[in-house]
UniProtKB/Swiss-Prot annotation:
Free-text cofactor note: Binds 2 magnesium or manganese ions per subunit.
UniProt-listed Enzyme Commission number(s): 6.3.2.4
Positions bound to ATP: 176-231
Alphabetical list of PANTHER family matching this protein: D-ALANINE--D-ALANINE LIGASE (PTHR23132), D-ALANINE--D-ALANINE LIGASE A (PTHR23132:SF25)
Catalytic activity: 2 D-alanine + ATP = D-alanyl-D-alanine + ADP + phosphate + H(+)
SUPFAM superfamilies assigned to the protein according to its UniProt record, in alphabetical order: Glutathione synthetase ATP-binding domain-like, PreATP-grasp domain
Protein name per the record: D-alanine--D-alanine ligase
Domain ATP-grasp: 141-349
């Protein structure tokens, strides 16, 4: 007798600034899980988390997937339950493996991973530790530094430092002395370039700190380097493997949210035109970065490469990378010989190891 399909609980949406990206990623993942031979092996059970953190069952999730954007509140069943997670909207024995397609806080940061761990059910991606450290840029950078991995200079701070004029002035002076301009101001716990700004002088730095503080209480300011932006994808658990290296090129001043998710605003070069030795170095750094934060399953590692000096700087790791039409993670594996349906199947099988 043929075996029963593996039931995949695809969770998407989420109470984060990357809600819209998550919906787009989920559409890609679900289509891949239902393509070709996967249709016989997997049964998709979609669950939607709205922007207030409420979990909704399949019929609501399917409506969101069909219209490719969040439902208006008056389209949701009333009376609305309280915001936040209360319970699963389905029996958890309906799911064999969870596939979180969540970006940003409350999904990529170890919170949902902790829930699945408590439930005793397998899930795609890193565990609680790797997800949490990989989400918080300050914790991530500390782990990279402890592993001896190269990074651009940076300064970390708490929003409380900005609420006292004297402390803020000292902090700004330190940033200018240690990093100079240009520099990039980032919330520690956001992705997809949400809340990030480039500062070329003090007024822009102050404005950037204020904007980043809208998204997080922990911030990081990084020295801006003139370098190529390269990415490498990682797959596996017991034995991690790295994809070919890809490059993002764009006309904009930097790789912001609009450039990242608007068709035609950026171009990808896969594989990136690099000497073999440089590609091998970047692949090695990608694997070392995963080990440093205890990431596994899937990850995308971003680096800067200065052609003139030959320097490679580790930028960040993303433990739940996007799966949109502009997302590098699936494209990097496609160029490495792993088609999207095979990729999602491997991710599910890895989760069950």
């Amino acid at each position: 007798m043929p075996s029963s399909p593996v039931r995949i609980g695809v969770v998407f949406g989420g109470a984060s600034g990357e809600h819209a990206v998550s919906i787009r990623s989920a559409i890609t993942v679900i289509n891949a899980l239902q393509e070709g031979q996967n249709r016989d092996h997997f049964e998709v059970v979609p669950l939607y988390i709205d922007q207030e953190g409420r979990w909704w069952p399949e019929h609501i999730a399917n409506s969101v997937l069909e219209q490719k954007q969040p439902l208006a509140e008056d389209s949701l069943p009333h009376p609305l339950p309280p915001a936040g997670f209360r319970s699963l909207p389905i029996d958890n024995d309906r799911v064999d493996v969870w596939f979180p397609v969540l970006h940003g806080p409350n999904g990529e940061d170890g919170t949902v991973q902790g829930l699945f761990t408590l439930m005793g059910q397998p899930y795609v991606g890193s565990g609680v530790l790797g997800s949490a450290v990989g989400m918080d840029k300050l914790a991530m950078k500390a782990a990279f530094a402890a592993a001896g991995l190269p990074q651009v200079p940076y300064v970390g701070l708490n929003v409380a430092d900005l609420n006292h004029p004297e402390r803020q002035n000292k902090l700004v002076a330190r940033i200018e002395a240690e990093l100079g301009y240009p520099c990039f101001v980032k919330p520690a716990n956001m992705g997809s370039s949400v809340g990030i700004s480039k500062a070329r002088h003090r007024d822009q730095l102050l404005a950037g700190l204020k904007e980043a503080a809208r998204h997080d209480t922990r911030l990081v300011v990084e020295h801006g380097v003139s370098a190529r932006e390269l990415e490498c994808a990682v797959l596996g658990r017991q034995q991690l493997k790295a994809s070919v290296v890809g490059e993002i090129s764009f006309e904009a001043d930097w790789y912001d949210y609009e450039t990242k998710y608007t068709d035609g605003c950026s171009q990808t070069l896969i594989p990136a035109p690099l000497p073999d030795q440089v590609s091998a170095q970047i692949q090695a750094i990608a694997l070392q970065a995963c080990t440093a934060v205890h990431a596994y399953g899937l990850a995308r590692v971003d680096v800067f490469y200065d052609e003139k000096s030959g320097d490679i700087w580790l930028n960040e790791i993303n433990t739940l990378p996007g799966f949109t039409s502009q997302s590098m993670y699936p494209m990097l594996w496609e160029a490495s010989g792993v088609a999207l349906p095979d990729l999602v199947a491997q991710l599910v099988h890895t989760a069950r190891e």
